[in-house]
């Protein structure tokens, strides 16, 4: 008799499935179609437990177990990645790619006058100043975000503009000494690597870089790349080897000698400071360049920024010229 009563009191697998589905439907997660990856992890876990039909697990135990999986799934992302996901479908939001900054005051050890020494430019090179304005604008646009090969991959168009403005050289009409344009298309996906608490990712893409000039001042090249990186909320490292496809100009065929075959990007947050570094190097020639920076709070949406560069390849016009520069200004978006 007791056995019969226990069987009556114990919910059947079908009853448990109904209870779990009702509980899931009543949760705030189901009320929003724009769920995060961690919320989807929770939903999938509950449905998986229903499919397994484990009669000994109570509703509370299953939800507790799935909450742990949800927390673990949340750890494999970053604040920046979550914010980008939230605004990906907003047509009024431009997603930053690389750093966006303005350095109104920069000083070089010695400005590169070599490209302007021909008779075409006369004595214009004499008017170039060691002080100039440097700024960078960089953004990316998602082209495909829906399950290309897996649930976490995306295809982007990226564009970066970096400019060097001789604003203080009034004697030669304050020209833009060089402006570099970097359009690219790249595929990005998360990697199933469990090492660390952050997110492993990979990028594969094609990039064209040019200064938009003609004749003697023209510089450009094309490359394909495949990089791998690791990111947490306070740390990021990304290495991007590339293969040079060549350029349309015959005057920078040796660009690899100075820019190398890869780029390494790192960032680290310490309290309110963020330290960044971007470098490239050619192990055969011994040439390379390093850009190091530190940002700090200044205004609500603007950070102060100090940047230092040493080496070759700060710009395309200077790819084979060794330069040192220090600059101060503002930073709109950082790396992490």
Predicted regions and their residues:
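Outer-membrane beta-barrel "beta-signal"
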Residues: 323-336
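Bacterial N-terminal signal peptides that target proteins for export
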Residues: 4-18
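Outer-membrane pore/translocation modules
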Residues: 109-129, 144-269, 279, 307-312, ...
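Long, repeat-rich segments with strong aromatic
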Residues: 262-307, 312, 334
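Outer-membrane beta-barrel initiation region
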Residues: 46, 50, 54-183
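Membrane-embedded beta-strand positions in outer-membrane beta-barrel channels/transporters
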Residues: 132, 136-138, 182-184, 225, ...
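N-terminal signal peptide c-region/cleavage motif recognized by signal peptidases
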Residues: 26-28
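Cleaved targeting-peptide boundary
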Residues: 31-37
